């Protein structure tokens, strides 16, 4: 399907996007960014995921087909998201066709998810999204969203929004290897050349670590090449344990004046996850040395 031109809305400065692997600490970063005055959407779950992005883009089967067929199709979805969130840009038939297909595939279980959506969820989300498209509320300040899967779309987003800023949240790879949150491995692993070694829910630390490495390498390489200073790698472990080592850089990245910001309230949000350091309870000899060297090269101790 060939789509109409899908550039950013006139006057758009581009969104701030927060992505990373599920369970890497993106929720904490989203909470901090909200405290700093960035609008992340009206339809969020408890983890601060923007559910409109989830509906429109958490679709591995469609993504592979669209990028092979017509990469511009992906950008139609970006226009929908921007219009719904900040009332910028106009929609055409291609946009409503895009939305309709996303809803239909979600309802029929064709998103490529590891488990089906809750019955009625796609209709509820699309209803709120359509209402926002019809009665969109302008937001003049900084805006964006947090949805871990966003990093998969970094390349087309960088092409679509010249002013895009992206925060890639990364957590110790060995902690992530033993995470029960395997969703991205099963959804996107093949895109990165990583095949899950077991069914969803079954521990597969080597495959999880391989995906962590591949995703981080691609995000950082693409982010620095395409965005330069508008790309930030944020270390969750440091943020959660020593926020004052991270907050000044984050505030500078967001181009904010630190005077008057609720820094005490933000520091109070930074509490390490109970699972931090869980890798120490496991036998690391199950990992190949190449993977452990990659973890070390990215700045984490392996002990």
Predicted segment positions?
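PAPS-dependent sulfotransferase catalytic core
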Residues: 1-124, 269
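PAPS-dependent sulfotransferase catalytic domain
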Residues: 104-122, 131-261
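A general structural signal for well-ordered secondary-structure junctions
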Residues: 39, 163-164, 301
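PAPS-dependent sulfotransferases, especially Golgi type II membrane carbohydrate sulfotransferases
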Residues: 1-17, 21-22, 34, 68-69, ...
């Amino acid at each position: 399907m060939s789509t109409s031109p899908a550039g950013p809305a006139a006057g758009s400065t581009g969104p701030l996007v927060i992505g990373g692997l599920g369970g890497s600490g993106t929720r904490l970063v989203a909470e901090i960014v909200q405290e700093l005055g960035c609008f992340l959407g009206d339809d969020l779950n408890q983890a601060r995921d923007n559910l409109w992005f989830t509906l429109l883009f958490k679709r591995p089967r469609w993504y592979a087909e669209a990028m092979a067929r017509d990469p511009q199709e992906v950008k139609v979805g970006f226009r929908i998201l921007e219009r719904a969130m900040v009332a910028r840009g106009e929609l055409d038939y291609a946009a409503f066709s895009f939305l309709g297909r996303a809803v239909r595939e979600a309802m029929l279980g064709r998103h490529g998810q590891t488990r089906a959506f809750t019955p009625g969820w796609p209709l509820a989300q699309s209803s709120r999204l359509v209402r926002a498209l019809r009665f969109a509320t302008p937001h003049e300040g900084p805006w964006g969203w947090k949805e871990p899967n966003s990093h998969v779309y970094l390349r087309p987003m960088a092409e679509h929004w010249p002013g895009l800023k992206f925060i890639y949240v990364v957590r110790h790879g060995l902690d992530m290897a033993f995470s029960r949150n395997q969703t991205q491995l099963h959804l996107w692993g093949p895109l990165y050349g990583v095949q899950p070694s077991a069914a969803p829910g079954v521990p597969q630390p080597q495959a999880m670590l391989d995906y962590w490495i591949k995703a981080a390498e691609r995000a950082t390489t693409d982010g620095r090449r395409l965005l330069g200073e508008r790309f930030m790698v944020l270390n969750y472990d440091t943020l959660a344990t020593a926020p004052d080592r991270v907050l000044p850089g984050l505030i500078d990245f967001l181009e904010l004046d630190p005077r008057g910001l609720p820094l005490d309230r933000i520091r109070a949000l930074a509490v390490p996850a109970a699972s931090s350091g869980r890798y120490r309870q496991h036998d690391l000899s199950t990992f190949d040395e190449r993977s452990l060297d990659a973890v070390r090269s990215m700045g984490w101790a392996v002990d």
